[in-house]
Design a protein with these regions (language model features):
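Short beta-strands within extracellular/lumenal beta-sheet-rich domains
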Residues: 32-36, 294-307, 345-347, 421
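Ser/Thr-rich low-complexity repeats and stalk/linker segments
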Residues: 35-108, 369-371
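Aromatic-lined ligand-binding clefts that engage carbohydrates, nucleic acids, or primary amines
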Residues: 49, 277, 304, 310-332, ...
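Loop/turn elements at helix/coil->beta-strand transitions in domains of secreted/extracellular proteins
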Residues: 110-111, 140-142, 192-197, 358, ...
Length: 530
């Protein structure tokens, strides 16, 4: 009897699991963009679309009116709503048979599709040190962002996003907003007092061809052929497996051979004998001082005196930017780590770690491409309350392990078409006001080609959204790179010219000139509001 009971339980459990895991295309479903808190584009006809049972009747109730359609044989449906004036909040009900979805807190205003690479992706938290007041005063339910998940698909355009939601700006949530897009939205809102929505589809390091459709890239045979190549899942797995094995092996060997971890007293501990350690002036690159030291790990340490009035207080340890990766210790305690060169190093020092008198900072730096060190003209300091202790100057240093250069990896997600299919295509039915674009750094190695690629991207997107010549606003690349005393060749200058030519050639485009907003030593300048 017990056996029969157990078998019955297993049977019903199996049935339950099967029913739960069956595809839900037969159920009423909306795309992730059409959800609570969405901002709809004013003054244009609106697409509301989704999925249901095949041939099922669909109704939408919105602002006192009802709209009808019938799902096709595949269960797809779309209802076109008439033009709406700015306002809200509103509710919308979508019904199919006995199923009903109610959407809350809908606003109507202007919606902008913001895309590009890292300078568009760069969130407000990265620029927080110079915009503290703007963050404190950011609360505004009429400014919202929808962050598109960062994914790729080389085989076909997708029709929905895996997740995502509309988020209103406030001092906490705004930290994850694109800084460029947020300040743009804030400016529009303050001028016109209408809701502003940002659909943020951006990814650091991405070249322009990754955002273009397969059809558009037929005019660029090398990119089109590359897109075909990456339809092969086995190829992607092989590339990623080999890259991962090689990279993991390099870092494993580095750790294994690092003298700083071989001793009874690891080098991150205080009171290590450093009598044979040479010195180096920080900031700077160690190969400029010690040409024989290139790739691998190098340990740095510096002693600082803390007065009794500051002892035990929390602090901020600011270490500018470091190439490539670093791990930081204070008085033998781990404080933080950063795995690649671009983010600013801002580490929180907890209370009770700093002591009166002598304190010691240790930084283990990893260089994998031959130019490791501390980027010049950045702040290196320990900040406690209103006191700033300068950390530039002489540091003790010693190489932990010498390594061969680590060859670069293939970033599959940057290959042609992939981001378009997964991050652009699902958004194209959603009505928008226009496009915001900050990109070009990743194409600077072929700057003349950009004067063909950028106009084609604009044409490509305008065709796909099917809203006519939607405004396309973009940022011209800012100044970047070491100052030179004589005129010289510059790919960035040529790419800026390509951007200018696009402005002159393509109607309804706008270009923000940012030549005075860059930082020579940082590809991610902070001044995103200006």
């Amino acid at each position: 009897m017990k056996i029969k009971l157990f078998t019955a339980k297993k049977f019903w459990l199996s049935i339950s699991i099967l029913l739960f895991t069956l595809p839900n295309f037969a159920q009423l479903r909306l795309p992730k963009l059409v959800s609570d808190g969405m901002i709809l584009q004013r003054d244009v006809k609106l697409n509301i679309w989704g999925w249901a049972k095949s041939n099922e009747a669909i109704t939408i109730d919105f602002k006192g009116k009802t709209y009808h359609t019938v799902a096709n044989a595949a269960g797809e449906w779309k209802i076109i709503l008439p033009e709406q004036k700015a306002g809200g909040p509103f509710e919308m009900q979508v019904k199919s048979g006995k199923e009903k979805i109610t959407l809350h807190d809908i606003l109507i205003g202007d919606v902008w599709f913001a895309s590009g690479q890292s300078n568009m992706e760069l969130p407000m938290r990265r620029v927080a040190p110079i915009y503290e007041n703007e963050i404190k005063t950011s609360e505004c339910t009429f400014i919202r962002q929808f962050f598109v998940p960062q994914r790729y698909n080389f085989k076909q355009p997708e029709n929905d996003l895996p997740n995502g939601k509309w988020i209103s700006a406030d001092p906490e949530t705004v930290l994850d907003f694109s800084a460029v897009a947020y300040f743009f939205a804030r400016n529009i809102y303050e001028k016109y007092k209408i809701p502003v929505g940002i659909i943020n589809a951006s990814l650091g390091g991405s070249p322009i061809q990754s955002w273009m459709s397969e059809e558009a890239l037929k005019e660029f045979p090398s990119y089109y052929q590359e897109a075909q190549r990456f339809k092969n899942d086995d190829l992607i797995r092989e590339i990623e497996q080999k890259d991962n094995e090689r990279i993991n092996g390099w870092y494993s060997d580095l750790r294994k051979h690092d003298e700083g971890f071989q001793k009874d007293l690891p080098w991150f501990l205080p009171h290590i004998d450093t009598s044979d350690w040479p010195t180096m002036t920080i900031p700077g690159y160690w190969s400029d001082t010690y040409p024989d030291i290139q790739n691998g790990s190098v340990w740095f340490r510096k002693k600082v005196e803390i007065p009794s009035r500051l002892a035990g207080k929390p602090a901020k340890l600011i270490l500018g930017r470091i190439v490539d990766a670093d791990s930081v210790y204070l008085n033998g305690k781990f404080v933080g780590t950063t795995s690649y060169q671009y983010p600013p190093r801002r580490y929180e020092v907890p209370a009770n770690l700093l002591r009166e008198g002598e304190n010691e900072i240790v930084v283990r730096v990893i260089s994998n491409m031959g130019k490791g060190g501390f980027v010049p003209d950045k702040l290196y300091a320990l900040i406690i309350d209103n006191d700033t202790i300068d950390l530039s100057g002489e540091w003790k240093m010693k190489q932990g392990a010498k390594m061969q250069p680590l060859a670069g990896q293939t970033f599959v997600r940057w290959e042609p078409v992939g981001l378009h299919n997964a991050m652009v295509a699902p958004v194209t039915p959603y009505r928008i006001k226009g496009f915001l674009w900050y990109q070009g750094e990743a194409n600077a190695d072929k700057p003349y080609e950009y004067r063909l690629l950028l106009p084609k991207l604009i044409e490509n997107w305008r065709v796909e959204w099917n809203q006519g010549e939607l405004p396309f606003l973009f940022v011209q690349l800012p100044n970047y790179g070491p100052p030179v005393s004589e005129p010289s060749e510059s790919n960035w200058a040529v790419l800026r010219e390509s951007q200018l030519m696009t402005l002159k050639k393509v109607p309804k485009t706008g270009m923000a000139v940012a030549i005075d907003l860059g930082e020579w030593n940082d590809i991610h300048p902070l001044r995103k509001k200006d």
